[in-house]
Amino acid sequence: MLYYLLQYINDVFDPPGFGVVEYITFRASAAAITSLLITIFVGPRLIAYLKRKYIEPIKEEAPPEHRKKKELPTMGGTLIIFSILVSGLLWSRFNDPYVWLILLAILWMGTIGFIDDYRKVVLKIKGGLAARYKLIGQVSLGLVVGLYTWYDPAFSVLQSQTTVPFFKNLTINYGIFYIPLVVFIITAVSNAVNLTDGLDGLASGVSGIVVFALGGFAYLTGNTVYADYLNINYISGAGEVAILSMAIAMSCVGFLWFNSHPAEIIMGDTGSLALGSAIAVIALLIKQELLLPVLAGTFLLETLSVSLQVAWFKFTRWRFGEGRRIFLMAPLHHHFQLKGWAEEKIVIRFWIITLLFFLTSLMTLKLR
């Protein structure tokens, strides 16, 4: 909205300096600042409200150190979603379908997460929303995104081919596997972020780094000069994804204002599922989905720790008559908690690991 207002003022009155509104970098910075300020200033009011009604109990199976923490208000993801929506709509172009697809994903999975949180903290239903209904929501979103991008001519480049990290001239044409791939990535990434959301500031910090990186890739993808130089797919309109990505990244940073240890609020499934779906859809739209195992490596490690733990436990119970574990507890961050690591140290180290994954993903632009 502000974009169109400033554009109108520039076209009609031509005041000096207003032409910067046409620059992606300016609007991305403005969206980032707007999102950060909204989160910081709205946060205290939302926390005060949620404390009265939406307190999530500590899980019985949590590590001993985790059970010592006071019960916190959940559904903090509503703050993240609100700041993204406002800043995104203020600074993005409404005629760009990329923007609407990302916002749809955030609202879609945010709603499913909200229902899950509501059932847990208000209706006192242990486990919240049944896993099968979450899966139905994730698969449905994947089908909507996949089918829309497959049949809409504006997205014709999306399903045709994608570049492969570390290989200069290697491309993949997904063909009929494109839609199943979209469903898988959206489901996998949203679940991965949800699994990672277990310590103060962990999921929000890691998500912020990953989305910031994707915003940089989106900017390069939407610029013909950079895309040609770096030998990546040029996608017209991907620059708008960079703007929304900066809004998402800074909403995570703003949320850390209240979610860093000791947390005043947690994002709940409302936030983790919304952020996970946003990461997945952004990567798919800018054709960097094959880079996700590197860029989002922290989420991958957390997910693998759970998968390996469950698989090994079932195998050893079948083979030896008793279940055995690889980790003290899964996901991985709880393993380190039980090893005696301080919560703050675990979170900071996971952030550092995520930054290393980020830098490695940048290297793939030239290591081909």
Curated annotation (Swiss-Prot):
Q: Name one GO biological process term.
A: peptidoglycan biosynthetic process
Q: What is this protein called?
A: Phospho-N-acetylmuramoyl-pentapeptide-transferase
Cofactor needs? Mg(2+)
Does the keyword Cell division belong to this entry? yes
EC number(s) from the headed UniProt entry: 2.7.8.13
- Please tell me one Gene Ontology term that the record gives under cellular component: plasma membrane
What is catalysed by this protein? Answer: UDP-N-acetyl-alpha-D-muramoyl-L-alanyl-gamma-D-glutamyl-meso-2,6-diaminopimeloyl-D-alanyl-D-alanine + di-trans,octa-cis-undecaprenyl phosphate = di-trans,octa-cis-undecaprenyl diphospho-N-acetyl-alpha-D-muramoyl-L-alanyl-D-glutamyl-meso-2,6-diaminopimeloyl-D-alanyl-D-alanine + UMP
Which pathway does the protein contribute to?
Cell wall biogenesis; peptidoglycan biosynthesis
One matching Pfam family is: Glycos_transf_4
| Protein family per UniProt | Belongs to the glycosyltransferase 4 family. MraY subfamily.
* GO MF, one example: metal ion binding
Instruction: Name the gene for this chain.
Output: mraY
Q: How does it sit in the membrane?
A: Multi-pass membrane protein
